[in-house]
Design a protein with these regions (language model features):
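Short glycine-rich anion-binding loops that position phosphate/pyrophosphate groups of nucleotides
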Residues: 157
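A structural feature that tracks compact, well-ordered secondary-structure segments
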Residues: 160-162
Length: 191
C-alpha cells in the first residue's frame, strides 16, 4: 500500500486541509484550539463554535497567523488530532507534503519540520510544495503549459498572487490582507 501514510497538508490561518492519498479524500477543519490555562478543551470545528462565545477563562486561538505558524506546539496538536481522526494512526513514519508560502525564511521552514516531527508526530518525511504550485495543481492547471496563468489565493489573513508559466513561478506577491479583513470592512461599511 504505497500511499497508506501519505498526506497533503495545507495549514491555513482559518482552516487545516488534509488530503489522504490512501482514502482519496480531503478533510477540512477549522484551525482553532480552545483551552483553559494549559488544558485543551476543544479543537477544530468544535473550538470554532466556541470562538467569541466562550467564557472569560477559556481562550480560543488559531496556531497560525497571516499564513505562518505562530504556535508550534498548538499547531502540532491540531494536526495530530486531525490525522488520528482520518486514519486512526499515531502519525509515525508518514510522508507529509505541506503547502508553504513562497517567501519563507529558514526559521519558518524549520517550523513545518518541527510540526511534523515534534512531540506527537514522529519520524515523518516532510516535503514542502510552494503554495502557488499547489494551488495550480488543485485547479487543474497544466504546469508545463507555456502560456501564463495567474493564480490568486485569498486566505483568511493573507492573499497571494502568482504568475506561473512553463513549470516556473515567474512572480509572486503576498500581502497581509485576506477574507477576514474584507469581511470586517464590508460589515463596518454596512453599519
Amino acid at each position: 500500500m504505497l500511499f497508506e501514510n501519505t498526506y497533503g497538508i495545507d495549514l491555513g490561518s482559518s482552516s487545516v486541509k488534509v488530503y489522504s492519498f490512501f482514502r482519496n479524500k480531503t478533510y477540512i477543519e477549522k484551525n482553532m484550539i480552545a483551552s483553559r490555562g494549559r488544558t485543551i478543551i476543544a479543537m477544530g470545528n468544535e473550538a470554532y463554535d466556541m470562538f467569541e462565545k466562550s467564557p472569560a477563562d477559556i481562550t480560543v486561538t488559531s496556531p497560525m497567523t497571516f499564513g505562518m505558524i505562530a504556535s508550534l506546539e498548538l499547531q502540532e496538536i491540531v494536526l495530530y488530532s486531525m490525522i488520528r481522526k482520518i486514519d486512526h494512526i499515531l502519525g509515525f513514519g508518514a510522508v507529509m507534503y505541506f503547502t508553504v508560502p513562497l517567501d519563507m525564511t529558514a526559521v519558518e521552514k524549520r517550523a513545518y519540520f518541527h510540526v511534523a516531527n515534534g512531540h506527537w508526530l514522529k519520524k515523518n518525511r516532510v516535503f514542502m510544495v510552494e503554495a502557488p504550485v499547489a494551488d495550480a495543481i488543485a485547479m487543474g492547471v497544466d504546469l508545463e503549459d507555456p502560456t501564463g496563468n495567474m493564480i490568486v489565493n485569498i486566505g483568511a489573513q493573507s492573499t497571494e498572487v502568482s504568475i506561473i508559466t512553463g513549470g516556473k513561478i515567474i512572480i509572486s506577491k503576498k500581502i497581509p490582507l485576506g477574507g477576514r479583513q474584507i469581511n470586517e470592512s464590508v460589515c463596518s461599511e454596512i453599519r
